[in-house]
Amino acid sequence: SPTDPNKKFTLEDAFALQRNRFEHLNGRFVPDDQIGVKKQGDDGSNDTVRKDQYKYALGNENVIDAHVYQINPNLPKSFGGTLWLGMGPSRNTPYVPFYGNLKDTYEAFKPQTATYDPNSWYWTVWHIDQMAINNQDLFGKSIQNHWKALEKQLIIEQKVSDAKYAALKADEAAAKAVEDKVTEDALARSERLFKQFKQYESELSATLKEAGRTDDPYRASLPDDYKDPTESSTEPSKEETKPSTEASTEPSKEETKPSTES
């Protein structure tokens, strides 16, 4: 590591790096996604914002899908290492491992909706991040700590899996033959975790509502410049209601009717 040459860089270090929001600098810098959001003084009345105070943190709101690729030389080449998938903003998202030889992915990874979708893995963890970052006084670091506890368990499980498949490194045919099993296990784990995420999302939303705060992920996922469509007017136009003041120059029917009298 940068501070200790005898310490190896771990997965947890990589996750922490991508979540970093200058917490270790004791207020020297503030993530620039907090401009106009977070006051730096007691009540904000005496704030003097330095020009260099706001910086772009690795855990910025715009850092999305910042995955971690783990190259393991002990695994068969066909496995392609391990991808620790971090969907959504890196600051408050869980990292979940997947081998590179999967034949299919879980259904929650497949929606491509542009706004919040409750059936989407991305939009679910995005919503959790939004609740965390917009209610720091209520949740603090609890959400990030929740993910860290999950990741600790996933790392343990992944080491067991790696050891099992490392035995196939010298036999590419055998490694190829287990791809269906690897895919099956990944789908089952994804389904289990997604159900947990949805439950956690629901619990956090309930906490906000109990605190009297609003939570509308559908509205929050719309573009910042989105404007609600105006209702179509049912009032008649001015042209329709304006009385005519011009005298008609067309002859009346009586004037144009030919005379039959002798």
Residue ranges and their predicted role:
Residues S1, E261-S262:
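Accessible peptide chain termini
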Residues S1-E231:
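C-terminus-biased signal that marks the final domain/tail of proteins
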